[in-house]
Each structure stands twice: as C-alpha cells, then as structure tokens.
C-alpha cells in the first residue's frame, strides 16, 4: 500500500472511526446526483477542509482543464481540478467526505491515497455514491440500490452482494482497493431518468443522502434539495405537457413502472452498474453515449431523444434565467 505522498494535509483533527463517503464527477455521476449529494453534505454538516489529492499525477488537464480566476485586486490565479477531502464531527458520527473529478490516470495509486487516509483515521467503512441512467419516470420515487462486501453490513442495512462483471469506474476500483485493505465497503446507486440525463437531479441526490443517513446514522437535512426536486419535477412536467408524443411515452413508462414488482432477483447489482429491473442495454452512464437510449413501449411517433434532451436543457436554463 502506498504512503500519503500525494496527499496535501490542510488540517489533521481527531476523528472517531469515521465513515468515508466518496463521490466523483464524470462516468459514475449521471445527472450530477452523487456529486450533488456530497456537496450538499459538505455545505450543510459543518464540514471543514481536511486534505487534497495532488492532481498532477492523476489528471489529464487537456480533458479537465484548470480555470483562471480573478482576485479582488484584478490579479489572476489558477484553480486546478482537485479531489478534496473534508471532515465532519458530530455527537453521533464522524465523516470524511471525498469529492472531485474522476481521475484519468494511475487509478490504483490514486485509490491507495484515499485508502491510506482512511487507514490514518481507522475508518469504519468506505461508502461510494453513484448514479446511473435508467428507464424510470421523473415523477416516481427515486430508486436507490445498495451493495456491500461485508455480510454484517448487508444484513444490518438491507444491502445486497454484488454479482456484476464488466466495465468499472473509479468507484469500483476504490471499493476494491479499500476492501483488499481490510475495510468494509458499500455503494449506493440512484436511478435517474434517461430522458433527462443531462439535467442535474436534486431528487436523486436527496434520495442518496436519505439512504446514506440510514446506514451511517447521521442526520443530514435535505429540505433544500427536496424543494429543488419539486421544482425540477414541475418544470419537466410543464415541458412534457407541450409534447403529446412525449407525454404518451411517459404515461406508458409510468404504467410499466407501476406494474413492475421489483425484488432482489430483479437486480444486477454492483459497485459499478446495478440494473433496476431492466436489461443492460437500457442503461447508460453519463459520458458513455452522446444520447442515452430510451427503451420500452414507445408511442406511435418515436421520440427523438437528442431533440428532447436539448429542449429540456434549454427550457430549464430559461427558467433559471427568469
């Protein structure tokens, strides 16, 4: 196991067997749900900066570019895309929150840095958050699937054991590295509507936080996300109401979802790509395809998913500007 050579400590507080909660933007973060969830925790749990992972070894800066910012005196500085860590202390539970872009290079070494921080604090568990695209309606309750490697964790929190084989993102490598180092690991995945793939989903973020809170025992407020989720639903409803073919498709999708009786055997569960009672070709991670596929019973006039996605994005941007 690597040492902490790529970790830049900001402060080193005392923590009591913290849970490490990690999310990364990119491939495993459909509709920004996982990263939004951790960002919300940072902003609402009194999180304090703990450390940063030096991005130089792990980032392709031609893909994720640094930004130039102006200081108050008009001088400039560069903000580098960095994975940051925060600490949270409370009477009930301590946390280490990890958030940043999925690294492009040297994944094993990167994950060893995170796991070394977990070892430094004798962490109790490492839990990754993710989100995937699926044929689910935006009006329905967000489905969250949890998987784990430790049988006690599975039994205590109604999680499932992974049986997935296939491509993985950084969360899969991180969980494997942590498990190999002796840590209990778990993953929580939220399903977001494929037809609104590029629209940030506060609804899915809230669902992830609620499920996470049940496992780690923290009281994380979600009122702000829930209010944003209500607006998110209303805006998409307004847009779809002006498109009869899409309204018909959504109605059929909702009816199909209402008829589905999900149980443990319906899931192809994993740290990387769980399946919510649908076939693998009905799922797509953000960034894998230019347009996530729509499947299931279609209306008489096929829905152009590219055009719909662009229309949804333009509509929500215009609502934000208003």
Where are these regions (language model features)?
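Hydrophobic/aromatic beta-strand patches that form the interior of the parallel beta-sheet core
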Residues: 51, 96-98, 127, 184-189
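Internal, conserved structured core segments that host functional sites
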Residues: 93, 101-152, 174
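Conserved active-site and cofactor/substrate-binding residues in soluble primary-metabolism enzymes
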Residues: 29-36, 105, 109, 165, ...
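Flexible, glycine/proline-enriched loop segments at strand-loop-helix junctions
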Residues: 24-28, 98-107, 157-165, 195-199
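N-terminal short beta-loop-beta anion/metal-coordinating cradle
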Residues: 1-100
